[in-house]
């Protein structure tokens, strides 16, 4: 009625689109959003926010076919607007179709200037979802434009190094592969300097030295040099100190590590950096057999703002509480702590026999927990089939709810990695329905929805 009275057919596009969105009438909504973009391409962020909201509330998955049909119709036209390539990139990132996202990003950059950041967005999203080959292509598109007048050149140079490292970590790799990445990181630092803007590559190089190339002393010197660098912001300095404390723990120097963690706690009393330092310091106490002090720290951290930190604290507090003997012998519990320290230091050949001993001779509480740690060790050694078998047996036999829940969650993660998605989905469903009180139920629900959305996307693409 307002349009008729004003004699303006394009009036109230947003308002009408929002109304149809709330009514879930997506067939009526999309043409209004398309017209909005035609009149004002700068509203793309606004439109994608609305579409994200619609997708998150679309329980029957009726909006994706409408979006796909609309994009197909628009992009078949000869001279369609660049903003629709931008919309196509956004949508294909939602459904993780990185190749199609890259195609539209290329088209967009052929039509418009200053759109290289789109490739950066694709690369970061692809890395998060382990689509490393597509991430590499996206970075190469940026690097292909050269250094001159290219503000995304350095982020792409850094990103491609990180991408290569993360890709190697997914499966057994030769030392020579890690040496090559370390060499490229060293060349980058020589070319662009040991400055605060390049701390991320320095940090990556330290990780390569420490955990992949058996050169922890080189890593320690590098991190010490970084910490002394002038003009570091407080957050970066804290992250470097945390990385160095982790390294000192790995190098069997828990006392120096504890000093650094304590400094981090005091410098960050009410944020996740401080909470994480407190958690790691509590783990050091647990490794050393100071069980009651460690439990007291875990109890404090149950209310941490970070879900990951609070979940770890809850798990460790519960494990110690259930297995500590106030008037009895805690040698098995202390042995478990020492064994976990060896696991932290990646001494797998020594860890596995110790875990087998704990599994075979300890009470069910410690035996089941040791089985979880053995599964983690096997995964770290890329023995996924053996780990999956162990976890499957544990979830069936254990009488401890929190152990069963963790076994289910670990097993579901392995099934996802092995592309056995139906089994993973069923395991996540079990966590949500049968273990709703566990620390994993919320994350399991999210992962279940992701798998379901992925299935529907495959159906739509057929």
Indicate residue ranges for each PLM-predicted region.
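Acidic, polar-rich low-complexity tracts and alpha-helical solenoid repeat scaffolds
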Residues: 1-462
